[in-house]
């Protein structure tokens, strides 16, 4: 099983292994598929007949990965209706990373914290300022 899913124009259809409710309108979608990515990278998420959008990788390991979404529009409302066992298309990871060698202060708010969670995990001594 390759860790780099697909960097072509064709999304790889993956089954949702778990859905975690993170708040009133936020959910994390987990996939039993390895993901090698660096802090700040994202995947393209494709919902057939709806659209394709970039989503930051919120969690990754040698066995699984996840992204977190907040329902605020047509695409994310459709995503919110998906359940464990449903499939969607994934391409990536894409994007540039950040240096994790120096100390850093990470500032995030609301669901935006999920987009920097891999950076926080990679930093040796992070200071995190979080607001709702």
Q: What would you call each of these model-derived segments?
A:
Residues 2-84:
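Ferredoxin-reductase
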Residues 74-132:
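FNR/FR-type flavoprotein reductase catalytic core
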């Amino acid at each position: 099983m390759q860790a780099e899913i697909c960097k072509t124009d064709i999304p790889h259809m993956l089954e949702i292994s778990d859905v975690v409710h993170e708040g009133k309108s936020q959910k994390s979608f987990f996939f039993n598929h390895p993901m090698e990515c660096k802090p700040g990278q994202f995947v393209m998420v494709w919902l057939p007949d709806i659209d394709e959008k970039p989503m930051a990788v919120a969690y990754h390991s040698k066995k699984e990965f996840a992204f977190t979404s907040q329902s605020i529009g047509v695409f994310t409302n459709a995503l919110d209706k998906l359940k464990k066992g449903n499939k969607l298309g994934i391409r990536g990871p894409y994007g540039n990373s950040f240096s994790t060698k120096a100390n850093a202060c990470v500032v995030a708010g609301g669901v935006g914290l999920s987009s920097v969670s891999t950076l926080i995990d990679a930093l040796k001594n992070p200071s995190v300022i979080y607001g709702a």
